[in-house]
């Protein structure tokens, strides 16, 4: 077959004029503030940040529940003007003189305006008195150290003493490694307090939010009378890869999701954020 000499072939490219457009300058570029738009990491839709916040940080296209901080949750659940915080002066120390821990705590406190990774107090839900504890993932990923364990324990004990139900919103990466055994012993301490609350015939409702893992899920987070969760919450003890390497098996794609746990009987109900207050009130009323 006759072949064309390569020198006669057309080059496969086009010439682009790289000269600057004199009409383009900084005045022509729209000034869009940073953070005004958010791309949903589940469905890929672009969301107006203000609309996302007004929709309780839930994507209107795919129902992805983004994380809320502790005060946002309190404002969402507790009747306006009824919340009274207690235990606010309980803060973490550095019992093991862990290098850099004190500086890290100081920086996080300044950044988040929180004293610890959980806020505890009393309030009302549609007029029903309740003790509430809300963990905050912004504070060292909600890790449970001695101060977090102490605040939760005191909240449960106060609920027991005053014969009130307690609701705990969990979010945590697990035990706080900088406190080692002081952190791990909080698992037993919080669990014992909840056992005494249960023996008194009182109601405990944990609400699992993304993520709830490690020592928290292995202790008070799964000891509720009725266990609720938000959609899509990551729930588990060890990490996915650690488990797969240990058992030498491939895990399901939805493993450690709230939906997977509900299907296998570890949760009682998955509740959308905009329905959560009504569902909690209904449970309180039935009890």
Swiss-Prot record:
Compartments in which it is found: Cytoplasm
- Which pathway or pathways does this protein act in? Lipid metabolism; malonyl-CoA biosynthesis; malonyl-CoA from acetyl-CoA: step 1/1
Supply the name of the protein.
Acetyl-coenzyme A carboxylase carboxyl transferase subunit beta
List the InterPro entries hit by this protein, alphabetically.
AcCoA_carboxyl_beta, Acetyl_CoA_COase_Trfase_b_su, ClpP/crotonase-like_dom_sf, COA_CT_N, Znf-ACC
Cofactor(s) required for function per UniProt:
Zn(2+)
- GO CC terms, sorted: acetyl-CoA carboxylase complex
Asked if the Swiss-Prot or TrEMBL record annotates the protein with the keyword Cytoplasm, the reply is: yes
Is Cell division there in the keyword field? no
Note describing how the cofactor binds: Binds 1 zinc ion per subunit.
Q: What is its EC number?
A: 2.1.3.15
Q: Which UniProt keywords apply?
A: ATP-binding, Cytoplasm, Fatty acid biosynthesis, Fatty acid metabolism, Lipid biosynthesis, Lipid metabolism, Metal-binding, Nucleotide-binding, Transferase, Zinc, Zinc-finger
UniProt-listed HAMAP family: AcetylCoA_CT_beta (MF_01395)
**GO biological process annotations for this chain's record?**
fatty acid biosynthetic process; malonyl-CoA biosynthetic process
* GO MF, one example: carboxyl- or carbamoyltransferase activity
Q: How does it assemble?
A: Acetyl-CoA carboxylase is a heterohexamer composed of biotin carboxyl carrier protein (AccB), biotin carboxylase (AccC) and two subunits each of ACCase subunit alpha (AccA) and ACCase subunit beta (AccD).
Q: What residues does the CoA carboxyltransferase N-terminal domain cover?
A: 36-287
Question: Into which family does the record put it?
Answer: Belongs to the AccD/PCCB family.
What would be one Pfam family of this protein? Answer: Carboxyl_trans
| Residues reported to bind Zn(2+) | 40, 43, 59, 62
Q: Which chemical reaction does it catalyze?
A: N(6)-carboxybiotinyl-L-lysyl-[protein] + acetyl-CoA = N(6)-biotinyl-L-lysyl-[protein] + malonyl-CoA
What functional role does this protein have?
A: Component of the acetyl coenzyme A carboxylase (ACC) complex. Biotin carboxylase (BC) catalyzes the carboxylation of biotin on its carrier protein (BCCP) and then the CO(2) group is transferred by the transcarboxylase to acetyl-CoA to form malonyl-CoA.
Gene3D superfamilies recorded for this chain?
2-enoyl-CoA Hydratase, Chain A, domain 1
> Zinc fingers (C4-type) at which residues?
40-62
């Amino acid at each position: 077959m006759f072949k064309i000499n390569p020198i006669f072939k057309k080059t496969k490219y086009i010439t682009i004029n790289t000269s600057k457009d004199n009409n383009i300058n900084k005045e022509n570029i729209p000034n869009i503030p940073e953070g005004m738009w958010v791309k949903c990491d589940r469905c890929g839709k672009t969301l107006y940040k203000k609309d996302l916040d007004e929709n309780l940080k839930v994507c209107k296209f795919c129902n992805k529940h983004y994380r809320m901080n502790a005060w946002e949750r309190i404002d969402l659940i507790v009747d306006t003007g009824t919340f009274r915080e207690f235990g606010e002066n309980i803060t973490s120390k550095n019992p093991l003189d862990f290098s850099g821990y004190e500086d890290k705590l100081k920086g996080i406190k300044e950044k988040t305006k929180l004293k610890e990774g959980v806020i505890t107090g009393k309030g009302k839900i549609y007029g029903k008195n309740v003790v509430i504890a809300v963990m905050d993932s912004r504070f060292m990923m909600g890790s449970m150290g001695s101060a977090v364990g102490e605040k939760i324990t005191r909240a449960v004990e106060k609920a027991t003493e005053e014969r009130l139900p307690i609701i705990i919103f969990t979010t945590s990466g697990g035990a706080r490694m900088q406190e080692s055994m002081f952190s791990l012993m909080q698992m037993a301490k919080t669990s014992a307090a909840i056992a005494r609350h249960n023996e008194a015939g009182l109601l405990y409702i944990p609400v699992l939010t993304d993520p709830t893992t490690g020592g928290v899920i292995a202790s008070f987070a799964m000891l509720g009378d009725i266990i609720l969760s938000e959609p899509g919450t990551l729930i588990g003890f060890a990490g996915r890869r650690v488990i797969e390497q240990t058992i030498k098996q491939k895990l399901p794609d939805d493993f450690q999701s709230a939906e997977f746990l509900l299907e296998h009987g570890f949760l009682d109900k998955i509740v959308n954020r905009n329905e959560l207050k009504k569902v909690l009130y209904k449970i309180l009323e039935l009890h």
